[in-house]
């Protein structure tokens, strides 16, 4: 029973993450605008994903517990390029991508570096959610922000809480997923709220 639940959580998470950012990317491409999206939020999310993936690889955790992160990073990079493209300058993305790539190698130079980065990872990821919330509160417009993407993110956090408890039982990772679940739900509700407000205004 436990093995079946673990398998379901792992594979459903991978399946969801394979398409997680596609609704958001599609919305941006269809609107030909990144209106409502927060660039700081996306950059912080990318940093959080990178640190988390490096930490899992460094400590040799089971690949099925983190295989979605390369997929998520690739989708976030595509979204980042879309934002810069529709804001008028794709070349501005180059320094950000260079920093992310070099960080992958720097993080594993010393054990204390990766441990410190992982301890900060929860704050980085939480900051990314708050940056998106702040953008929504400021504009009072969800724009092209995809509620589906954020609700799917909530699902993956919930499944990763289960898989963490059943495999590594790493408290740092568990705490991160609990906080991310709460914040993802908050962003989803906020997006839906401002979408309803916009529909009523029309």
Curated annotation (Swiss-Prot):
Transmembrane spans: 33-53, 64-84, 97-117, 171-191
Keywords, ordered alphabetically: Membrane, Signal, Transmembrane, Transmembrane helix
Keyword Membrane: yes
Location in or out of the cell: Membrane
Signal sequence residues: 1-19
Pfam family, one: PQ-loop
InterPro entries in UniProt: MannP-dilichol_defect-1, PQ-loop_rpt
GO cellular component: membrane
Membrane topology designation: Multi-pass membrane protein
Protein name: Solute carrier family 66 member 3
Organism, as annotated: Homo sapiens
């Amino acid at each position: 029973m436990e093995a079946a639940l673990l398998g379901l959580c792992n594979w459903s998470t991978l399946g969801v993450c394979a398409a997680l950012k596609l609704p958001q990317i599609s919305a941006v491409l269809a609107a030909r605008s990144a209106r409502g999206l927060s660039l700081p939020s996306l950059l912080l999310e990318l940093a959080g994903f990178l640190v988390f993936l490096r930490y899992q690889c460094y400590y040799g955790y089971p690949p099925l517990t983190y295989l979605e992160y390369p997929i998520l990073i690739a989708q976030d990079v595509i979204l980042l390029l879309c934002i810069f493209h529709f804001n008028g300058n794709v070349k501005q993305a180059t320094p950000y991508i260079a920093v992310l790539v070099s960080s992958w190698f720097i993080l594993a130079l010393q054990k204390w570096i990766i441990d410190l980065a992982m301890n900060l990872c929860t704050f980085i990821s939480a900051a990314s959610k708050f940056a998106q919330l702040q953008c929504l509160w400021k504009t009072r417009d969800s724009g092209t922000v995809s509620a589906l993407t954020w609700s799917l993110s909530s699902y993956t956090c919930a499944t990763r809480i289960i898989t963490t408890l059943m495999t590594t039982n790493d408290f740092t990772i568990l705490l991160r997923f609990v906080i991310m679940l709460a914040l993802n739900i908050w962003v989803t509700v906020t997006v839906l709220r401002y979408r309803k407000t916009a529909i009523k205004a029309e």
